[in-house]
Swiss-Prot record:
Protein name per Swiss-Prot or TrEMBL: Cytochrome b
Role this protein plays: Component of the ubiquinol-cytochrome c reductase complex (complex III or cytochrome b-c1 complex) that is part of the mitochondrial respiratory chain. The b-c1 complex mediates electron transfer from ubiquinol to cytochrome c. Contributes to the generation of a proton gradient across the mitochondrial membrane that is then used for ATP synthesis.
Binding-site positions, a ubiquinone: 201
Obligatory cofactor(s): heme b
Pfam families: Cytochrom_B_C (PF00032), Cytochrome_B (PF00033)
Gene source species: Acipenser transmontanus
Residues bound to heme b b562: 83, 182
Entry-linked InterPro entries: Cyt_b/b6_C (IPR005798), Cyt_b/b6_C_sf (IPR036150), Cyt_b/b6_N (IPR005797), Cytb/b6-like_sf (IPR027387), Cytochrome_b (IPR030689), Cytochrome_b_C_euk/bac (IPR048260), Cytochrome_b_N_euk/bac (IPR048259), Di-haem_cyt_TM (IPR016174)
Keyword Heme set for record: yes
Membrane topology of this protein: Multi-pass membrane protein
Name of the coding gene: mt-cyb
PROSITE patterns cross-referenced by the UniProt entry: CYTB_CTER, CYTB_NTER
Keywords from the named record: Electron transport, Heme, Iron, Membrane, Metal-binding, Mitochondrion, Mitochondrion inner membrane, Respiratory chain, Transmembrane, Transmembrane helix, Transport, Ubiquinone
GO biological process terms, semicolon-separated: mitochondrial electron transport, ubiquinol to cytochrome c
């Protein structure tokens, strides 16, 4: 008699995705981040749900309700610290997951890759509206500055901004709708993740060599289920360590001050995981140009599959492309540093150079290098 997990309508879907899934036997630890992102999402949804039970989305009580969660709710301080730092771990895993996809040429699975870029945008949007909810100084001014960027669009800009605000400034209506979006979007992300997995399982996973691995595949369980479990343990130890020992390490001190529309903080900046995009935005003197550069800094990922010129899939056997990949990583670190610095010399110039290098690597250097490597190997 056939096993129930292979015949039951629901269990056979789970079986095909997590148990009997044929998996390349040589995938490295860089392939762990997909499951870690799933864990991050579940952690964020659960901690967020418990926070939402005690939070009030009203400008007169939002800040106090967060303080109340930390002081009076059982383990509220822990739930809040895990949720706040969970976002940082989420983005660390996201950026490493994208970097793995770029290094090993996983972007050639176009449907999976494009859904992934949409997931990245959705996650960034969720994190942005979530940062506004505690209604501290940086929450308020971050919301004001970033939403105001939409006014750069010709004709419809001002109307668009007021429509998003629900009034003539960031106010109660803004906070209420941002809370609604912050609650809703993680479930949209969960749904999009299912589609991401569906597309991935149409083709199967890539592997570090970039070659077809059909001849050498193993079942996902027990080999990679235990490998994922090991990754879960490491990440949860890291997350709880940060949440317990230095919960405010990655936050902004300005957010301990309740929002005040009459006092502007000296340096308005987003959370650390958005600093690279913020640096690109600031490096262009024109408002509309900055907004478009900000958008394109993420959307450029959608062009990567189209700009792939090499006859080889990954960077494993392509030393020149490896150098450029690590140059891109270094460039993103420079942009992250610049995003947190004040707008003055020499930071402005460094930001402009780093932004130019960022787009030049994606649009010119990487495609050109792929073509050059083909020539060097006589692969016309």
């Amino acid at each position: 008699m056939a096993n129930i997990r292979k015949t039951h309508p629901l269990l056979k879907i789970i079986n095909g995705a997590f148990i009997d899934l044929p998996t390349p036997s040589n995938i490295s630890v860089w392939w762990n981040f997909g499951s870690l992102l799933g864990l991050c999402l579940i952690t964020q949804i659960l901690t967020g749900l418990f926070l939402a039970m005690h939070y009030t989305a009203d400008i007169s009580t939002a800040f106090s309700s967060v303080a109340h969660i930390c002081r009076d709710v059982n383990y509220g301080w822990l739930i809040r610290n895990i949720h706040a730092n969970g976002a940082s771990f989420f983005f660390i895993c996201l950026y490493l997951h994208v970097a793995r996809g770029m290094y090993y040429g996983s972007y050639l699975q176009k449907e999976t890759w494009n859904i992934g870029v949409i997931l990245l945008l959705l996650t960034m949007m969720t994190a942005f509206v979530g940062y506004v909810l505690p209604w501290g100084q940086m929450s308020f001014w971050g919301a004001t500055v970033i939403t105001n960027l939409l006014s750069a669009f010709p004709d419809i800009g001002d109307t668009l901004v007021q429509w998003i605000w629900g009034g003539f400034s960031v106010d109660n209506a803004t906070l209420t709708r941002f809370f609604a979006f912050h609650f809703l979007l993680p479930f949209v992300i969960a749904g999009a993740s299912m589609i991401h997995l569906l597309f991935l399982h149409q083709t199967g996973s890539n592997n570090p060599t970039g070659l077809n691995s059909d001849a050498d595949k193993v079942t996902f369980h027990p080999y990679f289920s235990y490998k994922d479990l090991f990754g879960f343990t490491l990440m949860l130890v890291g997350l709880t360590s940060v949440a317990l020992f230095s919960p405010n390490l990655l936050g902004d001190p300005d957010n301990f001050t309740p929002a005040n529309p009459l006092v502007t903080p000296p340096h308005i900046k987003p959370e650390w995981y958005f600093l690279f995009a913020y640096a690109i935005l600031r490096s262009i003197p024109n408002k509309l140009g900055g907004v478009l550069a900000l958008l394109f800094s993420i959307l450029v990922l959608m062009l990567v599959p189209m700009l792939h010129t090499s006859k080889q899939r990954g960077n494993t056997f392509r030393p020149l492309s490896q150098i450029l990949f690590w140059a891109l990583v270094a460039d993103m670190l420079v942009l992250t540093w610049i995003g947190g610095q004040p707008v003055e010399h020499p930071f402005v110039l460094i930001g402009q150079v780093a932004s130019t290098v960022y787009f030049a690597l994606f649009l010119i250097a990487l495609p050109l290098t792929g073509w050059l490597e083909n020539k060097a190997l006589n692969w016309n």
